[in-house]
Amino acid sequence: MSEKHPGPLVVEGKLSDAERMKRESNFLRGTIAEDLNDGLTGGFHGDNFLLIRFHGMYQQDDRDIRAERAAQKLEPRHAMLLRCRLPGGVITTTQWKAIDKFAADNTIYGSIRLTNRQTFQFHGILKKNVKPVHQMLHSVGLDALATANDMNRNVLCTSNPYESQLHAEAYEWAKKISEHLLPRTRAYAEIWLDQEKVATTDEEPILGQTYLPRKFKTTVVIPPQNDIDLHANDMNLVAIAENGKLVGFNLLVGGGLSIEHGNKKTYARTASEFGYLPLEHTLAVAEAVVTTQRDWGNRTDRKNAKTKYTLERVGVDTFKEEVERRAGIKFEPIRPYEFTGRGDRIGWVKGIDNNWHLTLFIENGRILDYSGRPLKTGLLEIAKIHQGEFRITANQNLIIASVPESQKAKIETLARDHGLMNAVKPQRENSMACVSFPTCPLAMAEAERFLPSFTDKVEAILEKHGIPDEHIVMRVTGCPNGCGRAMLAEIGLVGKAPGRYNLHLGGNRIGTRIPRMYKENITEPDILASLGELIGRWAKEREAGEGFGDFTVRAGIIRPVLDPARDFWE
């Protein structure tokens, strides 16, 4: 990995069809505007099916009724998922009230889905409501630009740090990076906001005419919390503070979790440390990382196009030196930092400014009025009286931020009355799933609908072995693309087929180690049998403070993944 050129800087060969699509799209316009007026289908045609992703949307259908509709000779019930751009997950109560109303009035499912990319999604937007959703977002100062496809996606930022003044500084940087790396095309404004076409030619000085080779994810993280799971991301800025003031960042590049079942050219990878940079170089370095990946990333094979593969192909040192050259700096040695956890601190936490933050556990991030737990109504009622903001966390929870002492009791009463503060065990708080069925077209197995009952069973195992208040970081992802971040969990389930999963073990609590596959293509009873035995051993044999993942490695149950490019599949 330290050789100058383990592989070529640029991969020669026939470009993937996605590259043709981007090149011919006229800076992401395609024929989306014309397609919107085609009432014969609920979906988008041809290239537009993929181009709408650059505008923050995915075309989906309800897979629960797909076969039934096919039998009736009907096309699938097409509807769009829309993902908002929300750097750092901060949303005002005015914005919240607007999205609450849109979800209720204009989506099939009526829900707001908080995601582990620290934003919200609407599921089930019919084609006739696609333009109105963008206009609604714009009216409250939001957009969905660049939240999907080959761009820098929503920038994450630690939600509830131990030093709250650091959050304000780090959050400002998350916003600046997001804005700096946005596409410059006017396609979004023209298509969705009816802004006039301008005679000037579009230019993309950072992203280029064909944008990035693949999705690109960025974080700003404030130790000791690794709530944003930095090792799942392409570019990570670890905040370094002196006397409570942000002075610079450690840069880590090349994390990513997506794999393809059976494709040994794909693997999950933790990010590599490049070095420390003072604050004034932040945007130049961020741009240099992105443009290096733009120019060197593999455009012939999308399965091998992410930054992690570029680093492995050209060598970490070569990539780092190119970033230094483009940014005009030399990285200083990495400054010391450590992580102690990545879960959210559920409940009230007092900030340094004497205001309070209330973190609410939202199982799988799904905000809806459930029987006996009207969560969506409760949050709307809080939004009506709260003077501060809401923050969406990368664990799919919600923080009512900056609550003055005088409002605390009133907000707590509303939260309790609407089931937003029901007691849950630590295991549930540390479990997470992606959406998967029925809306995700890539889903191979259930995730969000499977996790609550599966967690019940894991809690029963913990109880049986006398450790009911312990927790294991547990994630379920419906397919190997890995949106549920199972590849950084202590127990990771990756969907293989309906009712079947690959079981990965050996990650750690702080999210710095990739888990290895322990058993392949097994059913829930098989998974529970394995976990029952191993959790029993952990309860008896663990050392003081030893997490489940660390125990499985120390006890020789699983070999740790040390160099994923070479040993992930062993």
Swiss-Prot record:
Metal-binding in keyword set: yes
GO cellular component terms, A-Z: sulfite reductase complex (NADPH)
A Pfam cross-reference name: NIR_SIR
List of residues binding siroheme: C483
InterPro entries to which the protein is assigned, alphabetical: CysI, NiRdtase/SiRdtase_haem-b_fer, Nit/Sulf_reduc_fer-like_dom_sf, NO2/SO3_Rdtase_4Fe4S_dom, NO2/SO3_Rdtase_4Fe4S_prot, NO2/SO3_Rdtase_4Fe4S_sf, NO2/SO3_Rdtase_FeS/sirohaem_BS
Function text: Component of the sulfite reductase complex that catalyzes the 6-electron reduction of sulfite to sulfide. This is one of several activities required for the biosynthesis of L-cysteine from sulfate.
Subunit architecture: Alpha(8)-beta(8). The alpha component is a flavoprotein, the beta component is a hemoprotein.
HAMAP family registered for this protein in UniProt: CysI (MF_01540)
Protein name: Sulfite reductase [NADPH] hemoprotein beta-component
